[in-house]
Design a protein with these regions (language model features):
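Alpha-helical transmembrane bundles and membrane-interface segments of multipass inner-membrane proteins
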Residues: 1-204
Length: 204
């Protein structure tokens, strides 16, 4: 199979994930370089996130939508977000301690946010596969789903960069972005459930 440009961007996004995780986790095993490792990991994450928008845009614009892209693009997105959640939680959770939002509160908030995100993504993917296999119907991505993706990207960037670039904010930016991510993750999840439910119900 000859890969087109959107497909190559999707594969490139997957290839970037381990590099992003390695740079973020390196300070846990190394003795220094946390600031630069976090900056580099954030840049890699942002580049990977941009390819998510580019591959879909190019595929639609140039008529290069393929079955490979339909399958791998959302899978690559989930690998990226899941990898980011795991890496942040495993990175010694190096956030600035603060009287505003303590490390413990932020850790617990992000942990539960991560659980909700992973559960939501797996649930929606399962519903999509069941309905598609049963009736061949694909519910297109909603605006809520796109907003959800953006909140996840913003939250990950805040969690990585706020401790080193904006420590005087006392973790407030990261905490607020976690809450916003939780809200839109749940909201979009229920929206997809509502959209898929008639097909699931009729199939049963």
């Amino acid at each position: 199979m000859k890969l087109n440009t959107p497909n190559k961007l999707t594969i490139f996004r997957i290839v970037l994930i381990p590099f992003f995780m390695v740079f973020l986790l390196y300070p846990v095993f190394g003795e220094s370089g946390e600031m630069w490792c976090r900056i580099v990991s954030a840049l890699i994450f942002i580049i990977a996130s941009v390819t998510d928008f580019l591959d879909g845009h190019l595929a639609r614009k140039n008529g290069q939508v393929t079955n490979f892209g339909k399958f791998m693009d959302p899978l690559a997105d989930k690998f990226l977000i899941f990898g980011a959640i795991v890496a942040i939680l495993a990175s010694d959770f190096a956030v600035a301690d603060s009287s505003l939002i303590s490390r413990e509160i932020l850790y617990q908030t992000f942990l539960w946010a991560g659980i909700i995100v992973i559960f939501r993504e797996l649930a929606v993917t399962s519903m999509r596969l069941v309905v598609n296999n049963a009736s061949g119907i694909v519910v297109s991505a909603s605006m809520l789903g796109k907003i959800k993706t953006n909140t996840q990207i913003v939250c990950v960037c805040c969690m990585i960069l706020e401790p080193i670039l904006l420590p005087f904010l006392g973790n407030v930016l990261s905490f607020v972005s976690c809450i916003v991510m939780i809200v839109f993750t749940l909201w979009s999840g229920f929206s997809y459930l509502k959209a898929y439910w008639p097909y699931i119900k009729s199939d049963s």
